[in-house]
């Protein structure tokens, strides 16, 4: 998936704004309050259209609170009026096809339209049908990591058992501002128990652990790094040998904010890749 261009109208601080993105990397620079996060949130809503066709995932729409507010002098008071329609239009490529799609919210009581996004939803609908039939299409990783992920944790709306991890669950909460570490820990728990039962570590679990361990080793310089899921505490533990050659073991949640945030993002990316495409085994 590649977003080449996005055009937004009456979305938060923007009455009208258009942005183009480089195919490799786009860096957005601006003063505080100029709308950098707003632009990224608009992109996440556009990308969220892809998720609307997947079972148990749901899409991401435009909220009435996203509407631009205009100020009008009314005698001795200043009145705020939300502006509609709120519109987000994007163009790019998905599964080898060049597509354009648009989402709109026409009123505070309305719902985000999807009628102008059929090019996008038809692709995701076909992917969902193939998954349902047991086929193995390669699903793209989608994730959004906002500035509040370190402090905000997603509150689970339902009790998801260990057996629930079908492929599309790799898209659950992938565009939320708050992280869902509980779901990630449930995946580690399931795979750890499964590995213990079979007597061998699942290749995809080994690959995810290796990604986290390599990240921790590269930013700290510590050696013999291992990642283990603690079945007693239900936490991810980092085991390593420090500069004094002493063996240490700490829960990932107890690390400094910088380490924790970095490792959490790497872990989230890696485990979602394993959930979305488990048939790739160690190549996830």
Language-model features, listed with the residues they occupy:
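Extended helical coiled-coil dimerization/tether regions that scaffold
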Residues: 93, 170-284
């Amino acid at each position: 998936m590649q977003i080449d261009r996005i055009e937004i109208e009456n979305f938060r601080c923007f009455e009208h704004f258009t942005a183009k993105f480089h195919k490799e990397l786009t860096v957005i620079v601006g003063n505080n309050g100029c709308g950098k996060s707003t632009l990224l949130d608009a992109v996440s809503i556009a990308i969220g259209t892809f998720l609307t066709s997947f079972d148990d995932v749901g899409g991401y729409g435009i909220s009435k609170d996203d509407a631009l507010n205009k100020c009008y002098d009314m005698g001795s008071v200043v009145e705020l009026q939300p502006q509609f329609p709120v519109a987000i239009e994007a163009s790019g490529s998905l599964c080898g096809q060049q597509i354009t799609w648009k989402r709109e919210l026409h009123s505070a009581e309305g719902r985000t339209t999807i009628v102008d996004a059929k090019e996008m939803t038809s692709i995701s609908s076909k992917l969902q049908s193939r998954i349902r039939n047991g086929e193995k299409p390669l699903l793209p990783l989608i994730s959004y990591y906002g500035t509040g992920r370190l402090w905000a944790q997603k509150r689970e709306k339902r009790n998801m058992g260990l057996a629930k991890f079908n492929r599309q669950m790799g898209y659950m909460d992938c565009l939320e501002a708050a992280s869902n570490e509980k779901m990630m820990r449930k995946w580690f728990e399931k795979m750890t128990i499964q590995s213990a039962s079979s007597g061998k570590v699942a290749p995809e679990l080994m690959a995810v652990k290796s990604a986290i361990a390599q990240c921790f080793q590269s930013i700290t310089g510590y050696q013999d790094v291992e990642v283990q899921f603690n079945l007693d505490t239900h936490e991810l533990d980092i085991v390593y040998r420090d500069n004094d050659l002493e063996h240490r073991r700490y829960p990932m949640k107890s690390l400094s904010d910088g380490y924790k945030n970095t490792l959490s993002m790497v872990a989230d990316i890696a485990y979602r890749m394993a959930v979305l495409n488990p048939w790739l085994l160690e190549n996830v």
